[in-house]
Swiss-Prot record:
Nucleus among keywords: no
Gene: cicC
The name this protein goes by in its record: Oxidoreductase cicC
Signal peptide: 1-20
Keywords, sorted A to Z: FAD, Flavoprotein, Glycoprotein, Oxidoreductase, Signal
Length: 611
């Protein structure tokens, strides 16, 4: 899927017409103490929406972000959908530190002791400026379970749907630019039209998608009416976070920050600024944040609240260096205890994926190494309206299922019991057909370059039973935390992954797909057959789907493992909230950005109600 830089577009999204003030007026002065109504740490999936909602209602907001503009740091490798796989592989040496935190996990025992690069956006927009732009809702049953687990019905599916829709600005697909047999079906009643975040279907659907619809049907995954009404089991085209006009990435930056920059000076952004620690008065009242810009430390104080939205890794780190977390962890680094919350940094959950690759008789991202192909792709993208392969991330149709009965024979009783505890509509596997070659996922740009086009059927474990941790390596937040996802630590995840691999093969052997493959399986190849051989391959070739969450979990106040209550307020202190993926009680099936946007809208309303 390697695509070249298209430099013409690298700064287009920075154009801000009809300004009320110079753009620079929206950015803070490094080294100068300042007072605001609210200080928000992290300008990502949740932090940017919260800052927007507070600022638009007249409150002053300091938004602290360690990164800067992804348009500068990554250019079109961030903006153009087809480039979104750059720099997100497992190889720690293949990253872009201008836009990435360069997180590397501790050695993963079940992945051959590999230390894995965990791509994470260090930019305005956070990982919404780096991800694959896949957008859909979780299942109804999973959010109903969320409400049950936290003892608050306001978090169930029916009550959260309006907040998710509040964030959405859905544009129907331009079916005149898509193949006639690639028309998505969807329910307009569950898609918002007046929100900030652009969601749509890309102007190009790969020709393989229509074959995949039939292939999914052949193996028992019926086509369903979109992925946004609380149902996932089946198959459907997925929405993407794409701006419909220019077909650029839509992120929390484009949705919630760009509209305010140079227009609403209630929001002041401190970019390239690290949050060092949360400050407290009277021991437990949060009053501000000590920050650092280019080595200059200063204080941003909050009249009302401090809101941490730094993500599943940096949020627990910031809490711990500020004195909130497991007492024993803090004692190791001489950090004074503010609140003993043993759940901080615990319960890390994530999705993993891997899949076989095939040569196919169709155009895929493998053709991007052909100069003539790229030239034509650029011409189409530069047209009005933009069209062609560059408008598509390379993943546009998804499939979901519980593992079929015939593949559950090797599941242990422990695995069956754990999976049986999930809601009935919760799929155990997600299938992501990727129009290119995955290989061992160390570097997605490494392909055979043999003149053939490839298709990979990646299977993701979306019912993870393994649990990991995040810990501090120092009392300094500029030293990355210790991240231990413990992927495959629970044998059930390996058992489900084996089943997913076999089902990926079954899809490609289906009557619908058999006619488009050229030869047999290219990777890992037909020598990998037994469960033991598949497991050995999975340990080498699996990667994260980058859905880390749950490290500062929401729950009842009387539960000692709860870190926040159902309004995002940190238990044991006052004036401090968390609003990001870390407070999710568990990881729902699928891609979580929709629920994180909804979570941000929901808690922003709570903050304003308490103002």
């Amino acid at each position: 899927m390697a695509l070249r830089y298209l430099n013409k577009f690298s700064l287009l999204s920075l154009a801000v017409p009809t300004l009320a003030a110079p753009i620079g007026s929206s950015f803070g002065v490094p080294g100068t103490d300042a007072l605001y109504d609210y200080v928000v740490v992290g300008a990502g999936n949740a932090g940017a929406p919260v800052a927007y909602r507070l600022a638009e209602t007249g409150h002053t907001v300091a938004l602290v972000e360690a990164g800067s503009l992804y348009e500068y740091g990554n250019g079109n490798l961030s903006q153009i959908p087809a480039n979104s796989l750059f720099f997100i592989g497992k190889d720690p040496e293949w990253t872009n530190n201008l836009v990435d935190w360069n997180f590397v996990t501790s050695p993963q025992a079940e992945w051959n002791n590999a230390s894995v690069h965990y791509a994470s956006g260090k930019v305005l927009g956070g990982s919404t400026g780096r991800n694959l732009m896949t957008y859909h809702l979780p299942t109804k049953g999973s959010l109903d379970r969320w409400a049950e687990d936290v003892s608050d019905e306001s978090w169930n599916f029916d009550n959260m749907l309006p907040y998710i829709m509040k964030s959405q600005r859905f544009t129907p697909p331009n079916n005149n630019l898509r193949f006639r047999n690639a028309t998505p079906t969807y329910d307009p009643a569950v898609l918002g039209r007046r929100g900030r975040l652009d969601v749509t279907y890309p102007n190009y659907a790969n020709g393989l998608a229509s074959w995949l619809v039939r292939g999914f049907r052949d193996i028992g995954l019926a086509a369903i009416r979109g992925l946004n009404g609380g149902q996932l089991i089946g198959s459907a085209y997925t929405l993407s976070t794409i701006q419909p006009g220019n077909q650029h990435r839509a992120s929390s930056k484009t949705a919630y920050l760009d509209p305010l920059i140079g227009r609403n000076l209630n929001l002041i952004i401190y970019q390239s600024t690290h949050a060092k620690r949360i400050l407290f008065s009277n021991d437990t009242v949060a009053t501000g944040v000590r920050v650092s810009s280019e080595g200059q430390e200063y204080t941003l104080s909050a009249r009302n609240e401090v809101i941490v939205s730094a993500g599943a890794f940096k949020t627990p780190q910031l809490l711990m260096v500020s004195g909130i977390g497991p007492a024993a962890n803090l004692e190791r680094y001489g950090i004074p205890l503010v609140a003993d919350r043993p759940g901080v940094g615990q319960n890390l959950q994530d999705h993993t994926l891997a899949g076989p690759s095939y040569r196919v008789n169709a155009i895929t991202g493998s053709s991007n190494s052909i100069p003539e192909f790229i030239t034509e792709a650029q011409r189409q993208y530069n047209s009005n309206p933009p069209r062609g392969v560059l408008t598509n991330t390379g993943v546009d149709i998804l499939g979901w299922e519980k593992v079929p009965e015939q593949l559950r024979g090797n599941f242990s009783t422990e695995t069956e019991d754990a999976l049986a505890s999930l809601p009935e509509d919760w799929p155990e596997l997600e299938y992501l057909p990727v129009y290119g070659y995955f290989g061992d996922q160390n570097n997605y740009m490494v392909t055979p370059n043999d003149g053939f086009n490839y298709l990979t059927i990646a299977a993701a474990v979306v019912s993870p039973l393994s649990r990991g941790t995040v810990d501090i390596a120092s009392n300094d937040t500029e030293v990355n935390p210790i991240i231990d996802p413990r992927w495959f630590a629970h044998p059930g995840d390996i058992q489900v992954a084996v089943a997913g691999f076999r089902r990926s093969r079954a899809l490609m052997a289906s009557p619908a797909m058999a006619g488009i493959t050229l030869g047999g399986e290219s990777y890992p190849g037909t020598d990998v057959q037994t469960d033991d051989e598949i497991v050995e391959w999975l340990r080498e070739a699996s990667n994260t789907v980058h859905h880390a969450c749950c490290t500062a979990g929401m729950g009842p106040r009387d539960n000692p493992d709860s870190v926040v209550d159902t309004q995002g307020r940190v238990i044991g202190v006052s004036g401090l909230r968390i609003v990001d993926a870390s407070i999710m009680p568990f990881l729902p099936p699928g891609h979580p950005i929709s629920i994180i946007y909804g979570l941000a809208e929901r808690i922003a309303e709570s903050i304003l109600a308490d103002a």
